Amino acid sequence: MSENGHDRRSAQRREEILATATEVFFAKGFSRTSIDDVLERIGGSKRTLYRHFPGKEALFTAIVTTFSDRASNFAPATQSGELRPLLLELGQHYLENLLSRDVVAMFRMAVAEAPHFPEVTKVVYENGPKRACELLAKKFTEHNRNGREKIDNPAEAAQAFLATLRGDLFFRVLLTAYQPTATQIKKSVSVATEQFVKSHVTSSG
């Protein structure tokens, strides 16, 4: 097998391990899951698994990082210079991902395991809320260079916009079995956008 072929196979095996481990961790939680539980589902040897992940903690952290990245990655927005379309697009992408089944399950699991595995909550924070604020602040700064409306203090404004987007809806989904409709998510984004524009935006013209 060529080196490229071996690399592709290794990457595929890593993704298979991650996908299976995610199902097991979500079903049993971190503390009640063992490497043997994962291997029982996916097959193979411990040696192969440890070649990709040196232990259960590393495997769990990789899962958390994957879903945290999904929640904090914003879709590329059209740079039209118009602020409301930008906010609506970014807000819709963020809230849809944040409220998705897998991301919510990841947050629940991380919080439940925090007393025993505090490194996980740090990974969640740095790859989730913190990274989202940093990326959004960067987009706000870019908008200020080209847009007709200016966002006051992009770093603080990013925190405020994301907090308004999450609002009560995120905690309702996180702590109950509630599942918002697409219409409800769209409305939440619209309301958050209007509140944000009123409190954090000034006209340059």
Predicted regions and their residues:
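Amphipathic alpha-helical packing segments from all-alpha helical-bundle domains
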Residues: 85, 104-105, 109, 119-145, ...
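Hydrophobic/aromatic residues within well-ordered alpha-helical segments
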Residues: 13, 56, 63, 67, ...
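Helical hydrophobic small-molecule/effector-binding pocket
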Residues: 88-121, 162-169, 198, 202-204
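Amphipathic alpha-helical linker/stalk segments
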Residues: 27, 61-91, 96-98, 102, ...
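Basic, helix-initiating cap at the start of DNA-binding domains
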Residues: 1-44, 52, 57-58
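Short amphipathic alpha-helical segment with a characteristic S/N-K-E followed by hydrophobic residues
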Residues: 17, 55-60, 70, 120, ...
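Hydrophobic/aromatic-rich alpha-helical bundle segments in the mid-to-C-terminal region
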Residues: 122, 144-194, 204-205
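Key DNA-contact positions within bacterial/archaeal DNA-binding proteins
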Residues: 47
